[in-house]
Amino acid sequence: MTEVVAALESSLYPRASTSFSQEDLVDEWSDLDLERNTRVVRDGDRVVGYGAVRGRGELWRAEGYVHPAEHGRGIGKLLATTFERDAAAGGARRIHNGVYEPDAVARRLLKSIGYRAVRVFREMRIELAAPPPVPTWPEGLRAATFDPERDALAFHAAQTEAFADAWEYTARDFESWSRTNLASERFDPALWCVVRAGDEIAAGTICTANTYGGGFVQILFTRRPWRRHGIGAALLADAFRRLWEGGERRVGLGVDAESVTGAFRLYERAGMTPALGWVQYEKELRATG
């Protein structure tokens, strides 16, 4: 299945290096019931398209990929409409479907079946040529490496609170969050940062190595009372340094291009540049039953 993504990315971003691996796919699907939430389209023994849908409550999210050599066969529409039915059966009132920004074929398809574009996301990257500097933390804050036994519950709560004002954020309970993060084969507490103000967690990062072809900043957050004090820049510098010390020379992250926190501009100032882009499309669903 990773060959489908590699072929699609190469056709859309010929100058970008494609690095989606089987391990990346396993991590992305770690929280899914594969029988219920994923679909694979085959032509004989060859995978020509696949995707997944997930969600709770009124909003579900889908994504699908079709090998560029197989465009025009109705595979994308089959995946999209199947996910709509799955989401509606699960109680969804709306569904989001994300496609690569330059994928005109997928964008036309979604528009033709009733979707509208609602948001743009970017993957940003940086190549590290030298050891990143040690970050400077604002007065009164102290940074430490994540300790699962000591920090897990409070970290999850702080992350959930920090993302509460993010666009269309869906909170995850501690059990689900733990499965994705703490039970992952890529979990390395040395790549996580916990920033405290007194006894409270004010900010933090979750990073993983060997993800999408390099180090990856999965989560970077600052709780609202501590925003606008330079913590985000310090967190990013700390993430770069941890990943560098772990042997990574390329670092990536995903960002809402319209984030109210100004995250996109923060990452640009740190030297990161957009490598890939996705457009989120939305459709209202009719109730089933």
What are these regions (language model features)?
Residues V47, R54-R61, V66-L141, V279-K283:
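Acyl-donor-binding surface of acyltransferase catalytic domains
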Residues M1-V26, T136-A171:
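Short amphipathic alpha-helix that is part of the acyltransferase structural core
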Residues R15, S21-L25, D33-R46, A88, ...:
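Catalytic cores of nucleotide-enabled group-transfer and carboxylate-activating enzymes in metabolic
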Residues V40, R54, E63-R73, L220-R227, ...:
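A short, internal acetyl-CoA/4′-phosphopantetheine-binding micro-motif in the GNAT/acyltransferase core
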Residues K111-P133, A237-D238, G246-G289:
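Active-site/acyl-donor-binding loops of N-acyltransferases
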Residues G72-R85, T222, R228-E245, F264-R269:
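Conserved acetyl-CoA-binding loop-helix of GNAT-fold acetyltransferases
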Residues L12-N37, G51-E58, A166-T222:
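A conserved beta-strand-loop-helix scaffold within acyl/acetyltransferase catalytic domains
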